[in-house]
């Protein structure tokens, strides 16, 4: 029986990259032995902080950190109701921190505890954007020169709209020049306006241009971000077939996944789905019925490494590959959790990557190394990453509500982001 037990659980809020992050630190009775996890739900940081401080911390103190599965299962049902994104982000941070502790206890990196390496480097895809086809092409060429072989191409932010909400995206995403939205009423409610139909028609033109200019030696991806109707998603997926996308992401909203059956019958474009799911069972019918090719789990929203490894194995048995969600609004600790799973999963597909600025790398020593389109984690015990708490305190969070989620169609109707 282990003599180790949890003595303290704390949350650390910091924004060194301009994006609000939530970090969990679990301390033990062994001096210097602690674990770190990512609990970032950028849009609701204080709700997650409260869930950890007021509920999970008292629940955890005194428990053996080695009992990861038991802690996960008991914490998940301790509130009776099945968890939503707030509680699941809190639980994810706890779970990652426990795996970090277990790796440090064993003197091994987490990927060794998950079965060991299946590959030597982690292939990455990065984001490009532009106001028109030429700007997207130029941006993609720049990424290709950096060595990236997988590139996500957007023309304007999701749906062709632009935004100045820098708290979520690290750089301004311009509005597409050649998408002409329908007129709006005389008065307009606040929000980011876009035209789903005009956007859906523009994307095949974008990829026609890119394939003519860049050829087929680079893998191209696109994220619809649920900003089109299901029938338009089917039209788009079919129209994109000649351009051989690596995958089309989130063509429908989580509420409309039954449309994927019709999409699958009409198109061979590979589909990635699920960054908004918060329960691993939401993927089960999509995997069972072969409706998707890649799982887009946001590991910080589904409960951490423990459920992510299970859904990865289930996907492997059904010919589905992983593509963990990794936008700018997860901490480098969450990035490391993704990558330890990437290294140990035989059905790894691709890893999304958002470049980190110097401030992030200073606050979180041990960030993955990126070279020529591949990522490499270090071989230190645990997740291999730490936090400089004194430096983190110099980057306070802003909190508040984001504006980019307030998407509206031309007549002012609120649309899913």
Curated annotation (Swiss-Prot):
Keywords for this protein: Lyase, Magnesium, Metal-binding
Catalytic residues identified in the record: 158 (proton donor/acceptor), 225 (proton donor/acceptor)
Claim: Endoplasmic reticulum is one of the keywords in the record: no
Gene3D superfamilies the UniProt entry points to: Enolase-like C-terminal domain, Enolase-like, N-terminal domain
Residues that hold substrate according to the record: 43, 127, 275, 296, 325, 329, 352
Positions with a binding annotation for Mg(2+): 223, 249, 275
Cofactor binding comment, as recorded: Binds 1 Mg(2+) ion per subunit.
Cofactor(s) this protein cannot do without: Mg(2+)
Tree of life domain: Bacteria
UniProt site (Important for activity and substrate specificity): 327
InterPro entries in the record: DgoD-like, Enolase-like_C_sf, Enolase-like_N, Enolase_C-like, Mandel_Rmase/mucon_lact_enz_CS, Mandelate_racemase_C, Mandelate_racemase_N_dom
Any one GO BP annotation for this protein: carbohydrate catabolic process
Keyword check for Metal-binding: yes
Family according to the record: Belongs to the mandelate racemase/muconate lactonizing enzyme family. GalD subfamily.
Name by which UniProt lists this protein: D-galactonate dehydratase family member RspA
Source organism of this protein record: Pantoea ananatis (strain LMG 20103)
């Amino acid at each position: 029986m282990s003599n180790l037990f949890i003595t303290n659980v704390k949350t650390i809020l910091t924004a060194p990259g301009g994006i609000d992050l939530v970090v969990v630190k679990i301390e033990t009775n062994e001096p210097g032995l602690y674990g770190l996890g990512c609990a970032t739900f950028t849009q609701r940081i204080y709700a997650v902080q409260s869930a950890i401080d007021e509920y999970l911390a008292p629940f955890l103190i005194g428990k053996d950190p080695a009992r990861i599965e038991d802690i996960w299962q008991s914490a998940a049902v301790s509130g009776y109701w099945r968890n939503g994104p707030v509680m699941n982000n809190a639980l994810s941070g706890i779970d990652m921190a426990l795996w970090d502790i277990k790796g440090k206890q064993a003197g091994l990196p987490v990927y060794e505890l998950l079965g060991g390496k299946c590959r030597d480097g982690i292939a990455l895809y990065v984001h490009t954007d532009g106001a028109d086809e030429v700007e997207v092409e130029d941006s993609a060429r720049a990424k290709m020169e950096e060595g990236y072989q997988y590139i996500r191409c957007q023309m304007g932010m999701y749906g062709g709209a632009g935004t100045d909400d820098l708290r979520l995206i690290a750089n301004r995403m311009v509005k597409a020049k050649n998408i002409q939205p329908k007129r709006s009423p005389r008065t307009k409610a606040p929000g980011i306006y876009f035209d789903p139909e005009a956007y859906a028609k523009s994307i095949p033109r974008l990829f026609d241009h890119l394939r003519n200019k860049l050829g087929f030696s680079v893998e191209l991806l696109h994220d619809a971000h649920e900003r089109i109707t299901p029938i338009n998603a089917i039209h788009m997926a079919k129209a994109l077939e000649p351009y051989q996308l690596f995958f089309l992401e989130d063509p429908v909203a989580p509420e409309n996944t039954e449309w994927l059956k019709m999409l699958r019958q009409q198109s061979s474009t590979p589909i990635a789905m699920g960054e908004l799911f918060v329960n691993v069972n939401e993927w089960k019918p999509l995997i069972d019925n072969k409706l998707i090719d890649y799982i887009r789990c946001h590991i910080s929203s589904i409960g951490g490494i423990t459920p992510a490894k299970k859904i990865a194995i289930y996907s492997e048995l059904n010919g589905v590959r992983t593509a963990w969600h990794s936008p700018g609004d997860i901490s480098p600790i969450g990035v490391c959790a993704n990558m330890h799973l990437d290294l140990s999963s035989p059905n790894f597909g691709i890893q999304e990557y958002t470049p980190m600025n110097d401030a992030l790398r200073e606050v979180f020593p041990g960030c993955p190394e990126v070279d020529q389109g591949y990522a490499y984690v270090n071989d230190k015990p645990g997740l291999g990453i730490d936090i400089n708490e004194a430096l983190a305190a110099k980057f306070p969070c802003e909190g508040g509500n984001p504006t980019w989620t307030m998407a509206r169609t031309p007549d002012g109707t609120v649309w899913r982001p």
